[in-house]
Amino acid sequence: MEIAALITWIITAGFGAFMLARWASRGGLRHTEGTGTHLPPYRVFTHFGLAAAGLVLWIIYLVTDSTLLAWIAFADLVVVAILGLVMVTQWAKDGRAAMAAAAATGGPFRADASGVDLAEQHIPRPPVVLHGIFAV
């Protein structure tokens, strides 16, 4: 069972790395005219960093068989999951608003109501859903 958890964690990390790269490459880290994000970089990188730390703890647990490390990794994952839920809720809310704005104005689909192109709206839906499924 521990190996299955490791495999799903690695798959989840792969989808997460893809989403992080897409978000960063589409303007998530820079604030230039016409682009932006509603996902603060500190939240994105805290989610990423804690998830990576939890994965490392889990690997160390597998090697040492320390029950304490398993519980610390679990507690870490609770925080990671909460941050992930906050971000996916914002992503979905912005996606609905962008679709409504595009339908009303004929503007770009990924823009918010003020016309700002949101970096997170360039992340396709399938990786977000699969990341969430494998995380559970």
Where are these regions (language model features)?
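Polytopic alpha-helical membrane-helix bundles and their juxtamembrane interface segments
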Residues: M1-V136
